[in-house]
């Protein structure tokens, strides 16, 4: 399911005339926002975007409008099953934002990304997004398990209650994403205590960014149930601790075809020339993470390598062996807007010299 429509598995006569729609959008500071709408109408042939009405909200409360003209309009762009309302006709819609004149807001990065994706749709770009994050306690404002930690290392892909802090949240998140129709492809505990990762993809085009935003939304909703909160900051812990990234795996159809390694190397050269431009949208405070330590490259210099995790762009060994495949851009931070990152990679790689 790419999010455009799906058939309901539960069509109880008692509740088929009620639909609960969760509208999700990105606020003025890059944060997730949502509001709920109940529709008293029957949708018997399956949910489609055309079934979901445009809505609005108070943009002056989200740093996206002033009080004299505060209405901001939500245009549904993709639709998913709601894992929190399984016994009713519940859906989540990812929306982008427009003013009263239909002009996209400055913070509406989806609009500009979609222009790029439409321009290069014949390239069939695939993305695999590796979202790292920390689970924090509200009472200490520290990662869960931090009070027992000595040094990092034992927590990566760990098992056992002395190592694996927050697994219940991670497991519930994975199952909820699968129910929603998100192409989550895995999870693991990460290097620091309370640090986790989930992966989305491979997903083609702008759907990858839509799915990552909704996966984040689901994760943050689940964390509410445990009175915890999610931190995407690139370096929330100072000292000898790993930061959090959103490594972005990318390929076009030509890269995945025979002889694709040559296309990949040409793409790496293009990324090198646009390094500083990319870093502008690769996450706030990313300089605290990209130091050359803790499996990162320096933010000041572009580098690439085969199988290396201490470079800007990694080319997997299997890609070199096969002569085709994908590359991994390791520079994006965990707090990126995926619309900006996925689209700038596509534009840089595919634009003519």
UniProtKB/Swiss-Prot annotation:
Residues 19-102 form the GS beta-grasp domain. InterPro entries: Gln_synt_N, Gln_synt_N_sf, Gln_synth/guanido_kin_cat_dom, Gln_synth_cat_dom, Gln_synth_gly_rich_site, Gln_synth_N_conserv_site, Glutamine_Synthetase. Pfam families: Gln-synt_C (PF00120). Its EC number is 6.3.1.2. Residues 109-353 form the GS catalytic domain. One of its GO terms (biological process) is glutamine biosynthetic process. It catalyses: L-glutamate + NH4(+) + ATP = L-glutamine + ADP + phosphate + H(+). Gene3D superfamilies: Glutamine synthetase, N-terminal domain (3.10.20.70), Glutamine synthetase/guanido kinase, catalytic domain (3.30.590.10). One of its GO terms (molecular function) is glutamine synthetase activity. It comes from the Viruses. Keywords: ATP-binding, Ligase, Nucleotide-binding. Belongs to the glutamine synthetase family. This is Putative glutamine synthetase.
